[in-house]
Swiss-Prot record:
Any one GO biological process: endonucleolytic cleavage in ITS1 to separate SSU-rRNA from 5.8S rRNA and LSU-rRNA from tricistronic rRNA transcript (SSU-rRNA, 5.8S rRNA, LSU-rRNA)
Family to which the UniProt record says this protein belongs: Belongs to the eukaryotic ribosomal protein eS21 family.
Protein name: Small ribosomal subunit protein eS21
One GO CC annotation: cytosolic small ribosomal subunit
Top-level taxon in the UniProt lineage: Eukaryota
Entry keyword Transmembrane: no
């Protein structure tokens, strides 16, 4: 829902799992949100980060590590990270 100024005013905006595109419900207490920091060519953090959300379903199956690796390899090419 938007107000007259075009700002989002919803009380709850559900997140989606980055790996499966499933909606992460409010009762999914096993879900996590992970920020991965970007580094420069010297290996120093440059203030940027990428956020990934993983549902409890992916974590319960034991696929979180491979899903996060796959997502980061895809995103790394987009942000030109080494």
């Amino acid at each position: 829902m938007q107000n007259e100024e075009g700002q989002m005013v919803d009380l709850y905006v559900p997140r989606k799992c980055s790996a499966t595109n499933r909606i992460i419900t409010a009762k999914d207490h096993a879900s996590v949100q992970i920020n991965i920091g970007h580094v420069d060519e010297n290996g120093l953090y440059d203030g940027r980060f990428t956020t990934f959300a993983l549902s409890g379903f992916i974590r319960a199956q034991g696929d979180a590590d491979s899903a996060l690796d796959r997502l980061w390899q895809k995103r790394k090419a987009e942000v030109k990270q080494q």
